[in-house]
Amino acid sequence: MVCRTLISIALLESSLGLNNKREISLKDTSYSMFHITLNTAKKFYPTYSKMLLKYKLLNDVDFAISLAKRILKENFDYYKQKHPNKSMYQLVEMAVGAYNGGMKHNPNGAYVKKFRCVYSQVHYNE
């Protein structure tokens, strides 16, 4: 049960496409969780416009939850396959660490702040 809870938290908090290379630049802090998730969402919903995805991520909590779970299941499976000898706890730590490493600075922008608010609700309601 504890492992399952940790995995749920890690999967929702991470919301990064670990298989996707991130663009590293001086403005990396603005390349936030929202933008990473938005870009990764295009992979799952290629027929959706970015405007529609942005709207759904900001206004449809169920869509945001299902997208996060889908992206993060893929990410977690990636780590599990890459490190088969790691414990469940270590895999979760890696997923959370990847999230924290990319998101330590406060990103700017109303979209990001609203999206983080949606995700904190998701985190505590799950």
What spans do the regions from the language model cover?
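Catalytic glycan-binding domains that act on GlcNAc-containing polysaccharides
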Residues: M1-E126
